Amino acid sequence: LEKVSSSKPINKISEDSTNLYINEYNKKRDELSLNVQSLNEGIAITKMAQNSIEKQQEYLGNVQTKLENANSYEDKNDLKQSINEDLRNFNQVAYETKFKKENIIATNYYDDKKSIDINTKNANFSIEKPNTPTYANEIFELSNNSDLNNSTNLEQVSSKVRTSSNQLKNTYDDFTEFGNKLEFSAKETIKAQVDLYNENKINKDRNFGQESTDFSKTNVNANLGYLAASQANIVQAQSVRLLS
């Protein structure tokens, strides 16, 4: 009788241990999945920003080429109008580059958020939002208030374009650094998912965590694929908006 009665608390302890493990496992699994999702969105935002900055650099390149060939414009007002068109396109890219309706490479006075923040359970990542339209606006002001028949004025505008292009390159590089940090963290998080899966498998082999069967190696591999595919879909959607 004593043996039978003593087995009850032992079984209860075993059951409690199993339930505790399952709860902890599920909590950790969900936490890692949310982390991957946040990091994935951050990486996609980075790629969107860089794609748009590349387009903006093309427009600045067009402006620079037109300034270098200013003599081909008999009426310098025609040159200004042509430059203005590129600058308008530059700004259009800036204001159409959004993620979840939020501007990424443009800000204004009324913006609540002046930075892009990616938060996970273990780390927070942040990059200041660039206000790229200021580059185009400054070139616009200088160009339209200058006599482009004057070679000195022409060089001043050209110099301003070069400076803006360099600043834009720095912004691109900042996003590269930001993206690299996110990608490293994402890989570490997915590695943690693999480790969690392996740990869970060992415990299941010992008859623990029998109820926790929905997280398999397939899920981990799927996360790797999701990371790339989801980013591609987000970036592609942005590209379609910019081209339309």
Predicted regions and their residues:
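Proline-poor, low-complexity alpha-helical tail modules
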Residues: 1-9, 191-244
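Intrinsically disordered, low-complexity segments enriched in Gly and acidic/Ser/Thr residues
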Residues: 163, 170, 174-198, 202-203
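General secondary-structure propensity
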Residues: 25-29, 180-189, 208-213
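Amphipathic, well-ordered alpha-helical segments in soluble domains
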Residues: 59-62, 66, 164, 192-195
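The cytosolic transmitter module of two-component sensor histidine kinases
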Residues: 18, 154-157, 217
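Long heptad-repeat coiled-coil stalk/signal-transmission helices of membrane-anchored sensory
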Residues: 29-32, 39-46, 142-145, 151, ...
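Structural signature of extracellular appendage/secretion-system components
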Residues: 4-106, 182, 200-203
